[in-house]
């Protein structure tokens, strides 16, 4: 334990570590959460040209949007959808531009495009919610089921795989509960989902020198070696890397959740994620989905930390270690679209290379003839990869230093 605390203090004393933590906090919490809520994503539109043209009034807009949605709150039925669309069209006809921003029009419009494609008028430049006849918006859940079946067939997910996904989907409670959806859509679709990508960069910078840096200045390690041995020092470094990973995650996640609670509160936590993407099969509400996404990031970050520390132990150069570490995450992201679908799914199992938003998709893996829903593997395989790398990091570094 003494070795661990010494290594932990040594890591946090480094100026580069403090700078990285500060930059990561500013980028993700200040810009990605607080300013996103207050300005970029939810500030009322001013010039309609960019997020930077928005007014600095996101808190008020969010509260007004939540209040407006409550007038339709409860079960999402055909009548509810018709009322939402009719109310939007009436406000548009009355020229209530500011009031329109408080509606869930983007979400509702996506529902219309998914479930009622035959009502789309290609000659009309307006969005569907502006011109569609509300009385024709019937059979919401029947149409959703039909669209889901068609999607699975087009995706080649038939037979046993289709039935497997239907078994998962049957656990989704219907009718759906409805409140303001747009906030949760932004939160789960980008704010939380992007945390892993952001952490990967700064973890790579900090942890790449954890072992490799000792080749440039190993005086303190040499002193400790006379009493403890390289293996124990290596283990202390591994524990330090893991501790830093968890500490960075906790700082970002807790701060982000506090920001979320301030701006959004807890309203809508029990809505199903199907309100965001209708053909999602996961039987999750918004809160469960958020918890999953944070777990995905934490376990993925631990897995990535294990890989970075292994590379750092095996490579003497800090810069090369950093480049190789970042290539592990960002490389698959850059080449995935050029690869067969099966390889794309395999690359998603690399720590932080996949996406927590897979809970909105219908991806599966077949392992030894057994179908497994992809979100299960996306939170288990990455952390296992990292854990498997750690003993090799200890052995590799100890062997190199002894030599």
PLM regions: where:
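Secretory targeting signals
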Residues: 26-83, 133-214, 235-314, 318, ...
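Short hydrophobic, aromatic-rich alpha-helical segments embedded in or entering the lipid bilayer
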Residues: 343-364
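Junction motif at the cytosolic side of a transmembrane helix
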Residues: 5-7, 11, 310-314, 381-403
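N-terminal Sec/SRP start-transfer signal
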Residues: 1-23
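Central hydrophobic cores of alpha-helical transmembrane segments
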Residues: 21-25, 319-332, 350-351
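Residues that define the loop-to-transmembrane-helix transition and helix capping
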Residues: 18, 231, 318-320
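Hydrophobic transmembrane alpha-helix segments characteristic of membrane transport
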Residues: 217-221
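Short helix-to-coil transition segments within interhelical loops
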Residues: 224-230
């Amino acid at each position: 334990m003494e070795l661990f605390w010494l290594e932990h203090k040594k890591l946090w004393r480094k100026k580069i570590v403090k700078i990285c933590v500060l930059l990561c906090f500013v980028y993700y919490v200040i810009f990605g959460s607080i300013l996103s809520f207050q300005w970029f994503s939810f500030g009322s539109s001013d010039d309609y040209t960019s997020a930077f043209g928005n007014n600095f009034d996101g808190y008020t807009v969010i509260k007004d949007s939540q209040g407006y949605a409550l007038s339709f709150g409860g079960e999402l039925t055909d009548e509810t959808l018709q009322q939402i669309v009719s109310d939007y069209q009436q406000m548009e006809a009355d020229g209530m531009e500011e009031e329109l921003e408080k509606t869930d029009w983007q979400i509702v419009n996506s529902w219309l495009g998914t479930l009622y494609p035959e009502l789309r008028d290609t000659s009309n430049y307006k969005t569907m919610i502006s011109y569609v006849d509300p009385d024709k918006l019937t059979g919401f859940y029947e149409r959703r089921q039909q669209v889901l079946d068609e999607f699975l067939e087009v995706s080649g997910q038939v037979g046993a795989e289709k039935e497997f996904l239907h078994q998962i989907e049957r656990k989704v409670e219907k009718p759906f509960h409805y409140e303001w959806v747009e906030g949760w859509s932004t939160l789960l679709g980008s704010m939380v989902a992007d945390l892993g990508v952001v952490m990967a960069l700064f973890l790579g910078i900090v942890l790449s020198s954890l072992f490799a840096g000792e080749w440039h200045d190993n005086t303190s390690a040499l002193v400790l070696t006379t009493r403890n041995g390289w293996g124990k020092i290596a283990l202390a470094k591994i524990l330090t890397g893991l501790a830093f990973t968890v500490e960075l995650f906790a700082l970002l996640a807790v701060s982000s959740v506090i920001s979320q609670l301030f701006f959004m509160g807890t309203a809508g936590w029990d809505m199903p994620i199907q309100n965001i993407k209708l053909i999602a099969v996961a039987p999750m509400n918004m809160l469960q989905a958020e918890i999953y996404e944070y777990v995905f990031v934490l376990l993925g970050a631990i897995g990535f930390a294990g890989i970075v520390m292994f590379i750092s132990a095996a490579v003497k150069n800090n810069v090369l270690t950093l480049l190789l570490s970042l290539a592990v995450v960002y490389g698959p992201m850059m080449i995935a679209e050029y690869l067969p679908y099966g390889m794309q799914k395999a690359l998603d199992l690399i720590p932080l290379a996949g996406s927590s938003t897979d809970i909105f998709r219908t991806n599966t893996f077949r392992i030894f003839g057994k179908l497994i829903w992809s979100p299960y593997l996306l939170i288990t395989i990455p952390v296992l990869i990292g854990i498997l790398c750690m003993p090799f990091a200890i052995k590799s570094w100890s062997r190199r230093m002894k030599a």
